[in-house]
Amino acid sequence: MRKICLLITAFVMLAWSSVAFAQNVKVSGVVTDASSGEAVPFASVMVKGSMTGTSTNAEGHYSITVPKDGILVFSFMGYISQEVAVGNKAVINVKLEVDQQQLDETIVVAFGTATKESFTGSASVIKSESIEKMQATSVTRALEGKVAGVQLTTSSGSLSAKPSIIIRGISSISAGSSPLYIVDGVPYDGDLNNINNSDIESMTVLKDAASNALYGARGANGVIMITTKKAKKGQAVVTLDAKVGVNSKAARDYDYIREPGQYYEAYYLSRYNYFVNAQGLSSAAAYQKAASTITQSAKNGGLGYNVYTLPEGENLIGMNGKLNPNATLGRIVDYNGQKYYLYPDDWMKEAYKSSLRQEYNVSVAAGNDKSTFLASFGYLDNNGIIEGENMKRYTARLKADYQAKDWLKVGANMSYTNFTWNNANGSEGSSDTGNIFAFANSIAPIYPLYIRDENGNIMKDEHGLKRYDYGNAANAGLSRPVQSNSNGLQAVTLDKIQTEGNAFAGTGFAEVKFLKDFTFTFNVGVGLDESRTTDISNMWYGQFATDGGTISKAHERQFYYNLQELLSYDKTIAGNHHLNVLLGHENYTRDVYGLSAYKKKLFASNVTELDGAVVDGQNASSSRSSYNNEGYFARAMYDFDSK
């Protein structure tokens, strides 16, 4: 009777799980703009009341598995959210309506402002409330997933990596085409990592040719306009913002082979198929040849390493193509009188870590009918998800304006940044051995990370350093067929790439009103960026060990200035007809100076200057480049009843 009850209970549970599974349906569709019919990429698609969700792709398409009784919530910045009950629908296409409440907002456009309702171009605005919620170092990260038609790509996960931006609808067809950045009305050529997110009031992305026409060829790939905060009239306001968090690897990995046995099986199968199909061997002959060569050296078509212990005379892979059930992971090898223990390590686990991120910002703002004043200070201490990578940044900003006369207004905005970046990732190339992210992801799960003695203990060298397996015969005489003479994880602990520097940016303006409807504005902007990079490759291991280690120094200085003279006529006729005419002239100049030198054969491991190396690399160089742009432009805008 007890067995019957258990059987009935199991049957009921199975039936219940089947019913529950059947209640889930796969829904797909496309999200578009209700007025234009264009796709809305990266729109949020969430199951109401849960954490389940997805986003649309670049073409506005989505696919999600949801309960039949669920409700999907479609949303995107600038649009009214829409809820749709799933029911029995397999396809749900949604047309999002523009949020009309935002149309009266003033947005920053080329050389001026306009209301959203009267603006005829294509632009997206991100406010400070949205920017401050993000734990991002670069202001460009604030655009990620929040602006339709804007795609961000990064070649590595480095803290200092600068995302490439592609704006849909412009001439950009590759990540090499960057948009033009305008900060408080002036072109900005500095490092965007030097701008404190807490200082930003809004970011406007101009996406179409009409919106960017006044910037000429410079705006061909789109324009991103950054407006910094200013004080409001009223009592003094002191703001303190503190953020503490943890950085960790969040992106999911692809489903790839992680087990050593599965990797040997897959490699055996590829060799077996080759011998059968390309060389015409019989199944038995192909098995013998493939099974006997997979752990041999690369020149014999093998992987170079066998990390399994096998009974005498047995193959690692059986006739069925599966790992020998008698194989045990871990193998002791006697080589030149020294016993080594071969055991594969989890390279991903060793490469990544969780680390602390701290950010503190304080600001003081005050204003009255005549003037406003804002001062801010920020500190960021951000540690990366790999060993040896971190950054520190100090920022300060002063911004003020003064209504000297009814017809005269003046103002200034100055910012200073001091930064230090330690970039442990020697390369951002996806296939480079110096890129630890690529190295850890691509190396086969059969290879040891460390060199171990017969007891499994990690061996150390004469300097007290852990011995890493470089795949160059140092570990029991074995070599890797690929990624030989390299170990990205030891490189991040012994090598050093540090960039430190300072950045200053300042703008000023004078605005003169005359003849009631005319305004003349003079804008000036200057910027000075300087950075010093030290790149040290250790003297003991890796490709530069034969040189006794190397050190290179690079110093770059960039100075730019911008002058603008703008004359505008703004008139409202009969209450409904609004006309705005702009005439302008702009001159922009940028000079970049570079100096670099290289030496090798370091005196000691703690060398940080060229004097600490013996041999001159004979490749010291310097450079200078200049760029100048001058333009005259005009614009006329008309709207009726603000439409």
Named regions from a protein language model:
Residues 1-397, 402-405, 409-413, 417, ...:
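Short, small/polar-rich motifs associated with maturation and membrane association
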Residues 584, 633-639, 643:
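Exposed, low-structure sequence patches enriched in small/polar residues
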